[in-house]
Protein backbone atom coordinates (compact mmCIF):
# COMPACT_ATOMS: atom_id res chain seq x y z
CA UNK A 1 0.00 0.00 0.00
CA UNK A 2 1.38 3.39 -1.01
CA UNK A 3 1.66 6.48 1.16
CA UNK A 4 -1.40 8.11 -0.39
CA UNK A 5 -3.59 5.11 0.38
CA UNK A 6 -2.42 5.28 3.99
CA UNK A 7 -3.25 8.99 4.17
CA UNK A 8 -6.52 8.80 2.25
CA UNK A 9 -8.79 7.88 5.20
CA UNK A 10 -7.63 11.02 7.02
CA UNK A 11 -7.96 13.18 3.90
CA UNK A 12 -11.46 11.84 3.30
CA UNK A 13 -12.48 13.11 6.73
CA UNK A 14 -12.03 16.61 5.31
CA UNK A 15 -14.50 18.41 3.11
CA UNK A 16 -13.74 17.45 -0.51
CA UNK A 17 -12.81 20.99 -1.56
CA UNK A 18 -10.66 21.49 1.55
CA UNK A 19 -8.76 18.29 0.81
CA UNK A 20 -8.29 19.39 -2.79
CA UNK A 21 -6.91 22.71 -1.59
CA UNK A 22 -4.47 20.92 0.69
CA UNK A 23 -3.17 18.80 -2.16
CA UNK A 24 -2.95 21.89 -4.34
CA UNK A 25 -0.81 23.66 -1.73
CA UNK A 26 1.53 20.68 -1.45
CA UNK A 27 2.06 20.67 -5.22
CA UNK A 28 2.54 24.43 -5.22
CA UNK A 29 5.22 24.02 -2.57
CA UNK A 30 7.04 21.43 -4.68
CA UNK A 31 6.84 23.38 -7.94
CA UNK A 32 10.06 25.07 -8.95
CA UNK A 33 12.14 23.38 -6.25
CA UNK A 34 14.70 20.53 -6.49
CA UNK A 35 11.97 18.27 -5.12
CA UNK A 36 10.01 18.75 -8.34
CA UNK A 37 12.79 17.02 -10.29
CA UNK A 38 12.89 14.17 -7.77
CA UNK A 39 9.13 13.74 -8.10
CA UNK A 40 9.40 13.82 -11.89
CA UNK A 41 12.11 11.16 -11.91
CA UNK A 42 9.93 8.96 -9.70
CA UNK A 43 6.62 9.44 -11.50
CA UNK A 44 7.51 9.86 -15.17
CA UNK A 45 7.45 6.84 -17.47
CA UNK A 46 9.64 7.52 -20.50
CA UNK A 47 8.98 5.19 -23.41
CA UNK A 48 8.57 6.05 -27.11
CA UNK A 49 5.63 3.64 -27.35
CA UNK A 50 3.59 6.01 -25.19
CA UNK A 51 4.14 9.04 -27.42
CA UNK A 52 1.08 10.44 -29.19
CA UNK A 53 0.93 13.13 -31.87
CA UNK A 54 -2.51 14.74 -31.99
CA UNK A 55 -4.00 18.13 -32.93
CA UNK A 56 -0.58 19.59 -33.57
CA UNK A 57 0.86 18.57 -30.21
CA UNK A 58 3.33 15.90 -29.19
CA UNK A 59 2.32 14.20 -25.96
CA UNK A 60 5.01 12.15 -24.19
CA UNK A 61 2.24 9.86 -22.98
CA UNK A 62 -1.55 9.81 -23.43
CA UNK A 63 -2.59 10.49 -19.81
CA UNK A 64 -3.53 14.08 -18.99
CA UNK A 65 -5.06 16.08 -16.17
CA UNK A 66 -8.58 17.27 -16.97
CA UNK A 67 -9.69 20.87 -16.55
CA UNK A 68 -10.92 21.73 -13.08
CA UNK A 69 -7.98 20.45 -11.07
CA UNK A 70 -5.79 23.50 -11.70
CA UNK A 71 -8.36 26.18 -12.42
CA UNK A 72 -5.97 29.12 -12.17
CA UNK A 73 -2.85 27.72 -13.86
CA UNK A 74 -0.96 27.76 -10.57
CA UNK A 75 0.60 24.27 -10.63
CA UNK A 76 0.94 22.99 -14.23
CA UNK A 77 4.67 22.31 -13.78
CA UNK A 78 4.07 20.25 -10.64
CA UNK A 79 1.31 18.27 -12.34
CA UNK A 80 3.64 17.61 -15.24
CA UNK A 81 6.17 16.32 -12.73
CA UNK A 82 3.62 13.75 -11.57
CA UNK A 83 4.08 12.05 -14.93
CA UNK A 84 1.10 13.38 -16.84
CA UNK A 85 1.47 13.83 -20.59
CA UNK A 86 -0.45 17.09 -20.64
CA UNK A 87 -2.26 19.45 -18.28
CA UNK A 88 -5.48 21.29 -19.06
CA UNK A 89 -6.02 24.35 -16.87
CA UNK A 90 -9.25 26.23 -16.26
CA UNK A 91 -12.07 26.71 -16.85
CA UNK A 92 -11.06 30.29 -17.23
CA UNK A 93 -13.62 33.06 -17.67
CA UNK A 94 -13.26 36.66 -18.80
CA UNK A 95 -14.11 37.99 -15.35
CA UNK A 96 -12.92 36.71 -11.96
CA UNK A 97 -15.64 34.57 -10.37
CA UNK A 98 -16.16 33.30 -6.84
CA UNK A 99 -18.28 30.43 -8.11
CA UNK A 100 -21.19 28.90 -6.27
CA UNK A 101 -21.52 28.86 -2.46
CA UNK A 102 -19.81 26.09 -0.50
CA UNK A 103 -20.21 23.21 -0.04
CA UNK A 104 -19.99 22.64 -3.78
CA UNK A 105 -17.89 19.48 -4.13
CA UNK A 106 -18.92 16.09 -2.77
CA UNK A 107 -17.26 12.69 -2.65
CA UNK A 108 -19.31 9.63 -3.41
CA UNK A 109 -16.74 7.27 -1.94
CA UNK A 110 -18.83 4.11 -2.28
CA UNK A 111 -19.22 4.89 -5.97
CA UNK A 112 -15.68 6.20 -6.60
CA UNK A 113 -17.24 9.41 -7.88
CA UNK A 114 -17.51 13.14 -7.30
CA UNK A 115 -20.31 15.64 -7.69
CA UNK A 116 -19.33 19.25 -8.17
CA UNK A 117 -21.20 22.48 -8.68
CA UNK A 118 -18.17 24.75 -8.53
CA UNK A 119 -19.48 27.32 -11.01
CA UNK A 120 -16.26 28.23 -12.86
CA UNK A 121 -14.59 29.77 -9.80
CA UNK A 122 -11.34 31.28 -11.09
CA UNK A 123 -9.12 34.35 -10.98
CA UNK A 124 -10.20 35.62 -14.39
CA UNK A 125 -8.52 35.75 -17.78
CA UNK A 126 -6.18 38.66 -17.06
CA UNK A 127 -4.50 37.03 -14.07
CA UNK A 128 -4.54 33.49 -15.44
CA UNK A 129 -3.13 34.74 -18.72
CA UNK A 130 -0.20 36.37 -16.92
CA UNK A 131 0.52 33.13 -15.06
CA UNK A 132 0.40 31.08 -18.24
CA UNK A 133 2.75 33.43 -20.03
CA UNK A 134 5.31 32.85 -17.26
CA UNK A 135 4.88 29.06 -17.32
CA UNK A 136 7.47 26.76 -18.87
CA UNK A 137 5.87 23.36 -18.46
CA UNK A 138 7.56 20.13 -19.56
CA UNK A 139 4.33 18.92 -21.22
CA UNK A 140 1.65 20.60 -23.37
CA UNK A 141 -0.72 22.90 -21.47
CA UNK A 142 -4.28 23.31 -22.68
CA UNK A 143 -6.57 26.14 -21.65
CA UNK A 144 -10.24 25.42 -21.01
CA UNK A 145 -12.33 28.54 -21.68
CA UNK A 146 -15.77 29.02 -20.13
CA UNK A 147 -18.40 31.74 -20.26
CA UNK A 148 -18.64 34.32 -17.50
CA UNK A 149 -21.79 33.90 -15.45
CA UNK A 150 -22.53 37.61 -15.88
CA UNK A 151 -22.39 37.41 -19.68
CA UNK A 152 -25.68 36.84 -21.47
CA UNK A 153 -25.68 34.03 -24.01
CA UNK A 154 -26.14 36.64 -26.73
CA UNK A 155 -22.79 38.10 -25.68
CA UNK A 156 -21.02 34.74 -25.46
CA UNK A 157 -18.84 35.24 -28.53
CA UNK A 158 -17.26 38.41 -27.16
CA UNK A 159 -16.88 36.86 -23.71
CA UNK A 160 -15.05 33.78 -25.00
CA UNK A 161 -12.96 35.96 -27.31
CA UNK A 162 -11.82 38.22 -24.45
CA UNK A 163 -10.62 35.20 -22.49
CA UNK A 164 -8.88 33.63 -25.45
CA UNK A 165 -6.94 36.79 -26.23
CA UNK A 166 -5.66 36.96 -22.62
CA UNK A 167 -4.50 33.33 -22.49
CA UNK A 168 -3.38 32.91 -26.10
CA UNK A 169 0.34 33.35 -25.48
CA UNK A 170 0.51 30.74 -22.73
CA UNK A 171 -1.58 27.88 -24.08
CA UNK A 172 -0.56 25.03 -26.36
CA UNK A 173 -4.18 24.26 -27.25
CA UNK A 174 -7.56 25.79 -26.44
CA UNK A 175 -10.89 24.28 -25.46
CA UNK A 176 -14.31 25.88 -25.71
CA UNK A 177 -16.33 24.63 -22.76
CA UNK A 178 -20.05 24.86 -23.45
CA UNK A 179 -20.90 21.74 -21.48
CA UNK A 180 -20.47 22.47 -17.77
CA UNK A 181 -23.79 21.93 -15.97
CA UNK A 182 -22.96 24.51 -13.29
CA UNK A 183 -23.37 27.80 -15.19
CA UNK A 184 -27.03 28.61 -15.92
CA UNK A 185 -27.81 28.46 -19.63
CA UNK A 186 -24.31 27.41 -20.67
CA UNK A 187 -25.35 24.13 -22.24
CA UNK A 188 -27.72 26.01 -24.52
CA UNK A 189 -24.58 27.12 -26.35
CA UNK A 190 -24.12 23.54 -27.59
CA UNK A 191 -26.83 24.15 -30.18
CA UNK A 192 -25.43 24.08 -33.68
CA UNK A 193 -25.90 27.76 -34.52
CA UNK A 194 -24.49 29.07 -31.23
CA UNK A 195 -21.59 26.64 -31.23
CA UNK A 196 -20.68 27.51 -34.80
CA UNK A 197 -20.74 31.23 -34.01
CA UNK A 198 -18.54 30.94 -30.90
CA UNK A 199 -16.01 28.61 -32.46
CA UNK A 200 -15.89 30.61 -35.67
CA UNK A 201 -15.21 33.80 -33.74
CA UNK A 202 -12.25 32.23 -31.94
CA UNK A 203 -10.93 30.72 -35.15
CA UNK A 204 -11.04 34.10 -36.83
CA UNK A 205 -9.03 35.42 -33.88
CA UNK A 206 -6.33 32.81 -34.45
CA UNK A 207 -7.22 30.18 -31.84
CA UNK A 208 -5.38 26.99 -32.78
CA UNK A 209 -5.37 24.15 -32.00
CA UNK A 210 -9.04 24.58 -31.04
CA UNK A 211 -11.23 21.87 -29.53
CA UNK A 212 -14.74 21.72 -28.13
CA UNK A 213 -15.78 19.87 -24.96
CA UNK A 214 -19.14 18.11 -25.11
CA UNK A 215 -21.64 16.99 -22.50
CA UNK A 216 -22.50 13.31 -22.03
CA UNK A 217 -26.15 14.36 -21.76
CA UNK A 218 -26.50 15.39 -25.42
CA UNK A 219 -28.76 13.41 -27.72
CA UNK A 220 -27.18 11.48 -30.57
CA UNK A 221 -28.54 14.06 -33.00
CA UNK A 222 -26.98 16.92 -31.03
CA UNK A 223 -23.62 15.15 -30.95
CA UNK A 224 -23.83 14.65 -34.70
CA UNK A 225 -24.58 18.36 -35.13
CA UNK A 226 -21.52 19.21 -33.05
CA UNK A 227 -19.37 16.87 -35.12
CA UNK A 228 -20.59 18.56 -38.29
CA UNK A 229 -19.63 21.96 -36.87
CA UNK A 230 -16.17 20.63 -36.01
CA UNK A 231 -15.78 19.23 -39.52
CA UNK A 232 -17.20 22.28 -41.30
CA UNK A 233 -14.98 24.72 -39.41
CA UNK A 234 -11.92 22.50 -39.56
CA UNK A 235 -11.50 22.36 -35.79
CA UNK A 236 -8.72 20.27 -34.35
CA UNK A 237 -10.51 17.87 -32.03
CA UNK A 238 -13.27 16.99 -29.57
CA UNK A 239 -13.18 16.34 -25.83
CA UNK A 240 -15.69 13.73 -24.69
CA UNK A 241 -17.04 14.15 -22.11
CA UNK A 242 -17.79 16.61 -19.34
CA UNK A 243 -19.71 15.66 -16.18
CA UNK A 244 -23.32 14.46 -16.25
CA UNK A 245 -26.42 15.70 -14.48
CA UNK A 246 -27.87 12.19 -14.64
CA UNK A 247 -27.89 9.98 -11.57
CA UNK A 248 -27.52 6.27 -12.37
CA UNK A 249 -29.63 3.96 -10.25
CA UNK A 250 -26.42 2.19 -9.22
CA UNK A 251 -25.30 5.07 -6.97
CA UNK A 252 -25.14 4.20 -3.27
CA UNK A 253 -23.54 7.23 -1.60
CA UNK A 254 -25.51 9.61 0.61
CA UNK A 255 -24.41 12.58 -1.49
CA UNK A 256 -25.82 11.12 -4.71
CA UNK A 257 -28.75 13.55 -4.73
CA UNK A 258 -26.58 16.67 -4.53
CA UNK A 259 -27.00 19.06 -7.43
CA UNK A 260 -24.12 19.32 -9.89
CA UNK A 261 -22.07 17.33 -12.35
CA UNK A 262 -21.26 13.69 -11.63
CA UNK A 263 -17.82 12.37 -12.55
CA UNK A 264 -15.85 9.21 -11.92
CA UNK A 265 -16.52 5.50 -12.20
CA UNK A 266 -20.31 5.72 -12.72
CA UNK A 267 -19.90 7.53 -16.06
CA UNK A 268 -17.12 5.32 -17.44
CA UNK A 269 -19.23 3.27 -19.83
CA UNK A 270 -21.39 6.15 -21.04
CA UNK A 271 -18.41 8.35 -21.80
CA UNK A 272 -16.68 5.50 -23.63
CA UNK A 273 -19.82 4.91 -25.68
CA UNK A 274 -19.80 8.58 -26.70
CA UNK A 275 -16.11 8.44 -27.61
CA UNK A 276 -16.86 5.47 -29.86
CA UNK A 277 -19.95 7.20 -31.31
CA UNK A 278 -17.85 10.23 -32.25
CA UNK A 279 -14.92 8.18 -33.56
CA UNK A 280 -17.22 6.35 -35.96
CA UNK A 281 -18.25 9.68 -37.48
CA UNK A 282 -15.04 11.69 -37.69
CA UNK A 283 -11.30 11.29 -38.01
CA UNK A 284 -10.70 14.28 -35.73
CA UNK A 285 -8.65 13.43 -32.64
CA UNK A 286 -10.69 12.72 -29.52
CA UNK A 287 -9.71 13.35 -25.92
CA UNK A 288 -11.47 10.71 -23.83
CA UNK A 289 -12.59 11.72 -20.35
CA UNK A 290 -14.80 10.00 -17.81
CA UNK A 291 -14.14 7.39 -15.14
CA UNK A 292 -10.48 6.72 -15.91
CA UNK A 293 -8.68 5.45 -12.83
CA UNK A 294 -6.41 2.66 -14.07
CA UNK A 295 -4.66 1.38 -17.17
CA UNK A 296 -7.59 -0.78 -18.24
CA UNK A 297 -10.09 2.09 -18.25
CA UNK A 298 -7.64 4.33 -20.13
CA UNK A 299 -6.94 1.56 -22.64
CA UNK A 300 -10.65 1.03 -23.22
CA UNK A 301 -11.07 4.70 -24.15
CA UNK A 302 -8.07 4.48 -26.48
CA UNK A 303 -9.27 1.30 -28.18
CA UNK A 304 -12.63 3.00 -28.73
CA UNK A 305 -11.13 6.00 -30.48
CA UNK A 306 -9.47 8.35 -27.97
CA UNK A 307 -6.03 9.55 -29.02
CA UNK A 308 -5.31 10.80 -25.50
CA UNK A 309 -7.24 10.66 -22.23
CA UNK A 310 -7.77 12.86 -19.19
CA UNK A 311 -8.70 12.27 -15.58
CA UNK A 312 -9.54 14.18 -12.43
CA UNK A 313 -11.66 12.01 -10.13
CA UNK A 314 -9.22 9.12 -10.50
CA UNK A 315 -6.50 11.35 -9.05
CA UNK A 316 -8.65 11.88 -5.95
CA UNK A 317 -9.13 8.15 -5.38
CA UNK A 318 -5.79 6.75 -6.58
CA UNK A 319 -3.40 9.54 -5.64
CA UNK A 320 -0.43 11.29 -7.22
CA UNK A 321 1.19 8.22 -8.80
CA UNK A 322 -1.84 7.48 -10.98
CA UNK A 323 -0.24 8.69 -14.23
CA UNK A 324 2.84 6.55 -13.60
CA UNK A 325 0.72 3.53 -12.77
CA UNK A 326 -1.50 3.94 -15.83
CA UNK A 327 1.43 4.42 -18.19
CA UNK A 328 3.20 1.35 -16.82
CA UNK A 329 0.00 -0.61 -17.21
CA UNK A 330 -0.57 0.65 -20.75
CA UNK A 331 2.85 -0.64 -21.79
CA UNK A 332 1.94 -4.09 -20.49
CA UNK A 333 -1.41 -4.01 -22.30
CA UNK A 334 0.25 -2.94 -25.55
CA UNK A 335 2.71 -5.81 -25.25
CA UNK A 336 -0.07 -8.27 -24.45
CA UNK A 337 -2.06 -7.27 -27.52
CA UNK A 338 0.86 -6.93 -29.90
CA UNK A 339 0.73 -3.16 -30.49
CA UNK A 340 3.94 -1.28 -31.19
CA UNK A 341 2.58 1.96 -29.71
CA UNK A 342 -0.43 3.65 -28.16
CA UNK A 343 -1.18 5.21 -31.53
CA UNK A 344 -1.51 1.75 -33.07
CA UNK A 345 -4.24 0.90 -30.54
CA UNK A 346 -6.39 3.98 -31.14
CA UNK A 347 -9.82 2.98 -32.43
CA UNK A 348 -9.18 -0.73 -32.92
CA UNK A 349 -12.52 -1.63 -31.29
CA UNK A 350 -14.62 0.62 -33.52
Curated annotation (Swiss-Prot):
Residues 249-268 are annotated as: Disordered. Keywords: Cell membrane, Flavoprotein, FMN, Membrane, Oxidoreductase, Pyrimidine biosynthesis. Disulfide bonds: none annotated. GO terms for cellular component: cytoplasm; plasma membrane. Binds 1 FMN per subunit. Its EC number is 1.3.5.2. The active site is at 180 (nucleophile). The keyword rRNA-binding does not apply. Substrate binds at residues 71, 116-120, 177, 182, 242-243. FMN binds at residues 67-71, 91, 144, 177, 213, 241, 264, 291, 312-313. Its cofactor is FMN. GO terms for molecular function: dihydroorotate dehydrogenase (quinone) activity. Pathway: Pyrimidine metabolism; UMP biosynthesis via de novo pathway; orotate from (S)-dihydroorotate (quinone route): step 1/1. Belongs to the dihydroorotate dehydrogenase family. Type 2 subfamily. NCBIfam families: PRK05286.1-2, PRK05286.2-5, pyrD_sub2. Catalyzes the conversion of dihydroorotate to orotate with quinone as electron acceptor. This is Dihydroorotate dehydrogenase (quinone). It comes from Natronomonas pharaonis (strain ATCC 35678 / DSM 2160 / CIP 103997 / JCM 8858 / NBRC 14720 / NCIMB 2260 / Gabara) (Halobacterium pharaonis).
Amino acid sequence: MGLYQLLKPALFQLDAETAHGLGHRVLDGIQGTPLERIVADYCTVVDPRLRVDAFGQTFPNPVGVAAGFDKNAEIPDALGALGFGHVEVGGVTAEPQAGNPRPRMFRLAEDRALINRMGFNNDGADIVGERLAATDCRVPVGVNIGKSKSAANDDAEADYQYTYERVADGGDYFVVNVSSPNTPGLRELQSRDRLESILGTLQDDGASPLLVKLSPDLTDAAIEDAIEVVEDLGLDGIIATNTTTKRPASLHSDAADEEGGLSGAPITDESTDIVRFIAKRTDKPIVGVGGIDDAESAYEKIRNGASVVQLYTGLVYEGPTIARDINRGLLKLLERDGFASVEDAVGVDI
